[in-house]
Amino acid sequence: MSSSPMLGGIADRWRELHGQDSWNGLLDPLDLDLRSSILSYGELVQATYDSFNRERRSPHAGACVYGHGDLLAAAGASAAGSYAVTKFVYATSGLPVPEAFLLLPLPSLLPPAWSRESNWMGYVAVATDEGVAALGRRDIVVAWRGTVESLEWVNDFDFTPVPAAPVLGAAAAANPRAIVHRGFLSVYTSSNKDSKYNKASARDQVLEEVRRLMELYKDEVTSITVVGHSLGASLATLNAVDIVANGANCPPASSSSSQPPCPVTAIVFASPRVGDGFFKAAFASFPDLRALHVKNAGDVVPMYPPLGYVDVAVKLRISTSRSPYLRSPGTIETLHNLECYLHGVAGEQGSAGGFKLEVDRDVALANKGVDALKDKYPVPPRWWVSKNRCMVKDADGHWALHDFEQI
């Protein structure tokens, strides 16, 4: 078994692994380098969950616990040395959304809250020089966080269809019937003049940073990878097409760079359906755009919204129910959990059936945020917690909450 999700021939094969040929011949059986690449990107998404402050008694609820410099290492991402976080992304919504998506400090808290309107929604990162050597190019990653609470949001979210024009750029004229999910689009495009963190929308924050990085590395071979899980997967889908449709994957027109537009790939896990068939056609019309959707058998979220919406991505089907390490049948929670998804990717055997870990991925991670492992494994459920829940004894002998570094 490979000892690291970053080992293998990724540097030499990155265009193929990034979807240049729509992953033809790579999914069944699942190519080892592609498997490793998916796991690495999945860990970059998992870092958004492991770094998110979900303690509503904290004035920093809804923010990131860590700073740019230590987020990936503190969250345990194996690619921590291969990427540097360059920007945090914050989101709000112009529509009412479930608490599972925007988590805010308790109204009764005495210390001033960091924000009453916004949440930390992810980050932009770029490959370090070490990462370039491992990846074969300067990869820009946009990682979107999903929900942190129950799955009840699938029944409560606003599934009203609205025109997809805001993310289709000039292609909107050729695709006037393309529609997307109003709730997802609202979180992606909303700003709030009263919020310090969302005077610009999440969309504008990301596009500005991607353009800055494309300018900085205009003479290098680059790629853009947009990743997310659950609701974050929906935002990643909107973001990926938006980047291409509005030319953010191109070197700046004012530069003398000879580099062509770089490929943009969305790698998403457990994604709800974002748009209709016309949106899928619009998505497919961009030659530099690809999307791969990892979908677990039995997970209900990819079936929502149930009517009028379709999946735009190439599907990689997995089944965690085949794993001999996990309880079977799984629960709604475990079948949707990202760490369980990554466990499934590590062992998926496709049409051959069965389950075999092809990379050395610790099975204990499956219990990181849920109760998925069989009882014979000595791993407590939901074991990922900050030491003393971020309570620290100060020099004066009093305990205080230290749960943020950088906003």
Curated annotation (Swiss-Prot):
Pfam family of this protein, just one? Answer: Lipase_3
Recorded GO cellular component terms are:
cytoplasm
- What EC number(s) would the UniProt record show? 3.1.1.-
Report the top EC class in one word: hydrolase
Kindly give the InterPro entries that the UniProt entry links to this protein. Answer: AB_hydrolase_fold (IPR029058), Fungal_lipase-type (IPR002921), PLA (IPR033556)
Q: What does this protein do?
A: Acylhydrolase that catalyzes the hydrolysis of phospholipids at the sn-1 position.
The name of this protein is Phospholipase A1-II 7
Tell me the organism.
Oryza sativa subsp. indica
Taxonomic lineage from the root: Eukaryota, Viridiplantae, Streptophyta, Embryophyta, Tracheophyta
